[in-house]
Amino acid sequence: MRSIFYFALAFAALTCSNASAAFPNPDETRLLPDTFTKRSLRVAGQEVARGDRGEEIVRVIVQSTNKIFKRPAEKDMSKLIAAAKIAMLEKKMAKLSFVGKKAAK
């Protein structure tokens, strides 16, 4: 009984490998159909578009998180830079005052 199973398994493996080599078009030997790749891209927030020469181009669709949170490029960077400079100056002043207290002792 077990030998019949092994024979069927070997036959199926040989048949699949020979059948995939017989296709002249390499696109026909793919394991997953085109619809599966398009569905998985839709889940990831992307879509497939056709190029000029027939190739597939993957484009990213705007994700829903972009509607909720602002992107860093949309924020006013001058305010952030000014706040960072003030924080650096305060840090330097605190460091100098600590060194001055240490030298006075």
UniProtKB/Swiss-Prot annotation:
Residues 1-21 form the signal peptide. Keywords: Host cytoplasm, Host nucleus, Secreted, Signal, Virulence. The keyword Transferase does not apply. The keyword Transmembrane helix does not apply. Induction: Expression is induced during host plant infection. GO terms for cellular component: extracellular region; host cell cytoplasm; host cell nucleolus. It is found in: Secreted; Host nucleus, Host nucleolus; Host nucleus; Host cytoplasm. Its main location: secreted. A motif (RxLR-dEER) lies at residues 39-57. Belongs to the RxLR effector family. The RxLR-dEER motif acts to carry the protein into the host cell cytoplasm through binding to cell surface phosphatidylinositol-3-phosphate. Effector that enhances P.infestans colonization of Nicotiana benthamiana leaves. This is RxLR effector protein PITG_18670. It comes from Phytophthora infestans (strain T30-4).
